[in-house]
Amino acid sequence: HAASMGGSQVFLEPGETQTVDTLIKCISVASANDACVAMAEFIAGSEDAFVAQMNERAAGLGMKDTNFVNCCGLDVDNHMTSAYDVALMSRELITKYPQIHNYSTIWMENITHVTKKGSSEFGLTNTNKLIKQYAYATGLKTGSTGLAKYCVSATAEKDNIKLIAVIMAAPDYKVRFADASALLDYGFSVCQLYQDTTPPALPELSVRGGTDKKVSLSYEGTFSYLDIAGNDLNLIEKKLSLP
């Protein structure tokens, strides 16, 4: 089934053996529909079963305007999503699986087809031109079909601020990337990040009825605050509240 897909593909052949790592590269870099289906069949046994898992996960993420019918995004009735839902999905991906950037930032790379006929090289080229055109780009994924037109979920990082810009239904690929760049530029212009790298020292805390009369306290992590209102972050006051 995977070997018969249309659209963007890496031309997998029936009986071909590939690693999961290679298939993720094919999906992330070259938008390979055949690699998507091969992964779906490997994970869930069939594309339909995997699509059911996709819809369940989408519902759990609050993607209220999304319904998946296939695993690769080719045009089909009732297959739909929204820019907001794509942003939710993208945020989950880059937050829970930051290693995706190791794939989404590949510009060009070769894979090796391994079939009964032997081995052959196939070149992958990233469909996300922002990787080369936008200085702070970290990914993430392009998409285009006759109905959806030109789309992209673009991720970028500057000064520890990570942003997602989603463009859908652009008339051509140049507009898609130009609009994504403009959105990211705007986001970076209005966002500033405060990180407390010198938090107040924490005292020991008294314990009643415990083995130890006092325990040491520590911070779980660095306190961060994202400001989009243009406030003077130098005026932030620190207050320490203990139980």
Show the residue positions of the predicted features:
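Active-site-adjacent loops and short helices of periplasmic peptidoglycan-processing enzymes
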Residues: 1-96
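Domain-terminus/edge residues, biased toward the C-terminal soluble/receptor-binding domains
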Residues: 63-64, 75-80, 84-243
